[in-house]
Amino acid sequence: MTRIRRSPCLLLLIIWFMCIAGSVQVVQSQNQTGATTHPDEARALNSIFAAWKIQAPREWNISGELCSGAAIDASVLDSNPAYNPLIKCDCSFQNSTICRITNIKVYAIDVVGPIPPELWTLTYLTNLNLGQNVLTGSLPPAIGNLTRMQWMTFGINALSGPVPKEIGLLTDLRLLGISSNNFSGSIPDEIGRCTKLQQMYIDSSGLSGRIPLSFANLVQLEQAWIADLEVTDQIPDFIGDWTKLTTLRIIGTGLSGPIPSSFSNLTSLTELRLGDISSGSSSLDFIKDMKSLSVLVLRNNNLTGTIPSTIGEHSSLRQVDLSFNKLHGPIPASLFNLSQLTHLFLGNNTLNGSFPTQKTQSLRNVDVSYNDLSGSLPSWVSLPSLKLNLVANNFTLEGLDNRVLPGLNCLQKNFPCNRGKGIYSDFSINCGGPEKRSVTGALFEREDEDFGPASFFVSAGQRWAASSVGLFAGSSNNIYIATSQSQFVNTLDSELFQSARLSASSVRYYGLGLENGGYTVTLQFAEIQILGSTSTTWKGLGRRRFDIYVQGRLVEKDFDVRRTAGDSTVRAVQRVYKANVSENHLEVHLFWAGKGTCCIPIQGAYGPLISAVSATPDFTPTVANKPPSKGKNRTGTIVGVIVGVGLLSILAGVVMFTIRKRRKRYTDDEELLGMDVKPYIFTYSELKSATQDFDPSNKLGEGGFGPVYKGNLNDGRVVAVKLLSVGSRQGKGQFVAEIVAISSVLHRNLVKLYGCCFEGEHRMLVYEYLPNGSLDQALFGDKTLHLDWSTRYEICLGVARGLVYLHEEASVRIVHRDVKASNILLDSRLVPQISDFGLAKLYDDKKTHISTRVAGTIGYLAPEYAMRGHLTEKTDVYAFGVVALELVSGRPNSDENLEEEKKYLLEWAWNLHEKSRDIELIDDKLTDFNMEEAKRMIGIALLCTQTSHALRPPMSRVVAMLSGDVEIGDVTSKPGYVSDWRFDDTTGSSLSGFQIKDTTGYSMSLVAPGSEISPRDSDFKPMLGSKINEGR
């Protein structure tokens, strides 16, 4: 073969020809039409880019002409990442002399600020992609000008306010993306006019309410994401008419079941994700004809019935998740024979029978934890590279090699290892990281196993264990451990927070073989995957939310690590809970209920995250707290067992005798014994001893119904004993109601009830003792605490969250009626807990109450309650607003020692607001504070204290405003303060019959407690069955 020798001259000649050809192509791109950009659109685009501080690249801005180069080159696609920002033009106007801008892409380049109004003048736009920036402000009604729009996305930004109804004018729209923003208000009905929509992404948008009936018109939809939204009502039946759907996600909403039978029409689906349906049971019948499915996720939906054997006919399935339901019966063998199935999650059901004896080679991840499966395990469980979670079943493990699934014997039903014999008194785990010793000397054991989508682990010595399940949606590289090199500002154990365990669904930690008794459980967190939202990048716009259970009790709902850390990613968060171990077993469960964003900063950035778990005893341990020696002194062991059994028998007899005696003592107290939730019953002698016979030196204060004493129980716990005085007006009925109320609501921002005493004439409540006293003592007392701004803001947020729980989340709805600074207690870490439910009233959703006996404290009373006895949750909202002003100003709601215009805090706050001098309210003692947060708190306080209760926001919206998730609305009316109260001090006085006059001059006389209407008929009557004015 003849070879051609290339000379340098020849190479130069080739290069020259290439350059000429390239130049000709550029000139052609620039001049092939001779058209120019419409001058109005050129000015508009230049203004937009100037406002966003970005420039038009030379590739489509040749010689200053916008519609040139790549902007008119059909070979350059919008999706090409090399061209960003990018516009596209249509130069066919006015005999091909004028170009109109039809496409704009400004994607993921961290543009910060509002959308310039000039954008809405570009009426020839058909494609607008502004996703993954930090755009703020609202979408204006002028969006309706873009009537040619077909593909429009604002996904992953910080846009707020309502979505304008004018979006319904975009009737040619094919794609709408508004996910992962801070919008507020309801989903616009007008979107239903966009009948050509093929893709709709409204997940994590902040919208709420109902899915509009007009959405029944969206029959062209092919993809719909409706997730992480506070929407209500049942899943609409009309979704079954969206028969062109290939992808449907409805996760983490407030929608209730059952799943409509019309869903069986969705036979084109390839991906179906339904999750966290709140009520209503459904079967799996509706999936029968969905033969194109490759992803089927029906997690946490109250599914009942059996798994049909016909599921084996869905040959395209790659992932199946039916976990956290109520399915029963055997597992069909056909499910394990699906040739493309790689991930199978069946955990937390009541499936029974044996494990299928065969599986396909593709199936590498299987979760069947928390079921009733039994029998021997098949041989394939020993295959390498499998991820299996078989925890909490009834498998027979005899003959199983110890190297296969090590520790599974400890994690079968009832967790048998060391059950009935406490050998440990604590445990500490560095979740996702290596062994670390804390500054206090505690050794946090390593937990850096590759859990993957389904796994469990038991520590050496069987002191603790872990179990995790879940597959991150959309992630090609599922990572279950996060790491960081950050140094954390509020802890000496910074290294402990540089790793964290991640889970896409559920992760549990167990303490095994613990000595029975009370424990303090400490959970440590730091958000090391999602950046802080104060960063100037879209990667800081994510929100992670999950639930936390300790010993099966929900202690945190929608817990957000970063928000709790004050929006900081270098601030550690610690949560402390009390737990009782009665069967040598402790469980901490972190569960994702579909809330939070899914894809910021990466696909699959959601679900539980935790840095460390530890538990320490609240009593003096009697065990060695180390693994037992093996094979020594067998005789001693046998003797010990016999003696132990004998002693236990004697002890059991004593306990049974005591219980029977106590029950006999209380047989006449039918109300107490008939309660659904029974707190621990203390004896009078126990509490008398704990308080040193109610020694005056242990007195903490005097409440509305009697004194409160500090006490030390025999198990080492420090408590606050509320002793109801003989003269207290709180009768037996109200006492029982209070016990029921407090026992049924558990939240970190509500004071914890340990138990009660109801013995003869002695009636007492025993609470957790909070060492830092009350908020009014901290702010106004003789020995004030130094509360810096961030602490005050967290206290305000904590109180708001506690009230949200009382009003909207507790199993029984509660209006506190006496929210005030002295009823907000501070724990050792200055976390607020709302106390004193002695004035609380139980009520059903959407009920109200008119009472002639008004209970509360002057200065915190809402006008409609003080003057008319009209009680709703907005009564508490008003009082919260007053507390918020006290936190900002550092002064009580009234102070007779100040000049006239400043005597009454709320009146002074309004006067300053009218003069735009709100910041003068801020406490002079605060030398360093966040001005934006201070203004926010003042604005919220004024919203909460408006005269009309209908104008006050619900507490859930208050939390959203405090958290910065939604903007603060305008205050439209003067605060509802009541002037000319006849009193000397409003900081502690309880209302008890006096004359008041409101700002309109209306005067009335309040009925003193018990003076005209008996408590039995009025005040003590639960508000069940009456009507609430305020709808939710």
From Swiss-Prot:
Signal peptide positions on this chain: 1-29
Organism of derivation: Arabidopsis thaliana (Mouse-ear cress)
Extracellular side: 30-636
LRR repeat locations: 101-122, 123-146, 148-170, 171-194, 196-217, 242-265, 290-314, 315-338, 340-360, 361-385
Protein name per Swiss-Prot or TrEMBL: Probable LRR receptor-like serine/threonine-protein kinase At1g56130
E.C. number(s) listed in UniProt: 2.7.11.1
Modification Phosphoserine, positions: 822, 851
Membrane spanning residue stretches: 637-657
Lineage: Eukaryota, Viridiplantae, Streptophyta, Embryophyta, Tracheophyta
Modified residues (Phosphothreonine): 683, 852, 857
Subcellular location: Cell membrane
Matching Gene3D superfamilies: Galactose-binding lectin (2.60.120.430), Phosphorylase Kinase, domain 1 (3.30.200.20), Ribonuclease Inhibitor (3.80.10.10), Transferase(Phosphotransferase) domain 1 (1.10.510.10)
Entry superkingdom: Eukaryota
SUPFAM superfamilies: L domain-like (SSF52058), Protein kinase-like (PK-like) (SSF56112)
Cytoplasmic compartment residues: 658-1032
